[in-house]
């Protein structure tokens, strides 16, 4: 009877983790909103927008949230002056619903975007919130043309039921 040969044991190879997709990336943070956690949240938000996951992006906002894009850099008040965007949560929902519509002719063909977020700093912190300032560059590709937008964004990030959300953004 032939003797069974033992195969040499292969060294253990660490299993590769599946890469996190934007929708799988956790938005939950520990109690403290530190710089690294805030930066990761902003990168997650940018990725959702670049991938066109607007419903997931909308889910990052609290029910009382607002989003303001001033028309001038030194604009201090969204009510007394003209703004590019000044939306509460309900208007954000309408905006997202319109973007999903096949009749959104202003986005035919759809824009492809790439956002870069940097120079993230925490301006103010408190119990369960942080006001975060960041710089951004957004490149839009559409109709064989490229447009570049840049600016400063302010986010008020809050923790609600252990989850980080946007209370306001401008």
Locate predicted features.
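A beta-strand edge to alpha-helix "cap/lid" segment located at domain peripheries
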Residues: 114, 121-170
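A solvent-exposed, acidic/Ser-Thr-rich amphipathic alpha-helical stretch
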Residues: 63-133
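Conserved aromatic-histidine-acidic binding/catalytic patches
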Residues: 30-33, 80, 145
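Hydrophobic pocket/interface hotspot
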Residues: 45, 57, 92, 132, ...
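Short Lys/Arg-rich cationic patches that frequently serve as NLS/NoLS or arginine-rich RNA/DNA-binding motifs
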Residues: 1-23
